[in-house]
Amino acid sequence: MSFYRRLRLTTVVAITALALVGCSSAAPADQAESQEGGEGTGEGVAASPPISPCDSPFAQMSQRERIAQLFTVGVSSMADARRAVEQHNIGGVFIGSSVVGEVVAGGGLAQLQSIAPLPLLVSIDEEGGRVSRIAPYAGPMPSARVMANTMSPAEVRETARKRGEFLAGMGVTVDFAPSLDVSDQPDRAVIGDRSFSPDPARVTEYARAFSAGLLDAGITPVFKHFPGHGRSSGDSHFDAVTVPPLDQLTAHDLRPFAELAATPDTGMMLGHQQVPGLTGADRPASMSPAAYRLLRDGHGYGAPAFEGPIFTDDLSGMRAVSDEFSLPRAVTEALIAGADSPLWITTDGIGEALDSVEAAVANGVLQPERLDRSLQRMAEIRGIPECANGPVTGRMVGAGSLGAPLPLAAPAGPAGPAAPASPAAPAEPAAPAGPAGADVPSQPPAPAVPLPLLPR
């Protein structure tokens, strides 16, 4: 697992510990099986103690707490993150530009992990170019398009590895990158220079290198935006968008997803595109059972089955969703459709979303077994052991203010100049920034959309 690599724990120790507690496979939370201890071997010999049961780490949680373990929510501060964990037992957080400085300065993620009942998923979207949350501290990183035009795949892998090491030092575990979108849009379009190339083969080559670099650093990459956003009719931050029909996507936009679907220790993010021939006109891919089946099975576009966790794009701040669905309904519909982790950019609405999902389970619309499978997938990338009494490998036990030393660069401005870019990663001109360093969208933002935290 990538989380084991991230924490540099000895595999032998983990395997031995699991063997000692008799854990051979994960049991669903509601179906954990007990194992009987052996009897005495003869007169005067004490009976062997019972072997500890292999209970899921989620077995002692209420249904509501287990549902909350699937949510990934954006936080506005470390205090906001602590409230989400303490009040709702949230399993994942997303940190945007406004929180990165606090994390770097105060080491808040190690403290946050210490209060969580299980290792948290800590995510960010660090693509490079105009989608870079850590640039003021780690220096600039080129956009995907610039990297593909100026660097070899080996150089891109090394650049991503260095970026991943900085993220790991902060305590980040998941990066919503790279983009697998195939696009020839102008640089500042919604995808634009976030795409490596208009050539699917080149996108595959460079996205493979970028994701390998993140994995080298112990960061879980999440490919996006399935089934392809590169030829969309607009920006899903501001309106419903469509892409070409499925038969056209299969031969072009879906090729990188097909080539990389079998990459171990990775996730996928579904976008909010409407796809003729797949999703219909009434809902985006992120809430379409057909879109999740396409990704999971792989048969419909010539890919292997995808076994990793599936995230949604932001469900609260993007109007392709929020204009038609309330947050509680969007979260519930996404889980019913097949998402493992609904993602949204604020801690608002957690309670209402939990109420809605609980109601769906109570009404038989959402099966508990379906949630158990999602919990198992999310536990895998969070480093949660299969057995409740196994070693909790994901928690940063004994960490200082940060999980690992950070090669900090001073932020630009009065505090000092920004660190120069690595020679292997030539910098590009910085895009104009909105409030809190938000990357600039392709059209003026609506006032209700809090762009600084958006997972792009």
Give residue ranges: language-model regions.
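Hydrophobic faces of well-ordered beta-strands that scaffold small-molecule active sites
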Residues: 68-75, 91-95, 120-126, 174-178, ...
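Glycine-rich, aromatic-flanked loop segments that form ligand/cofactor-binding clefts
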Residues: 113-139, 156-183, 203-227
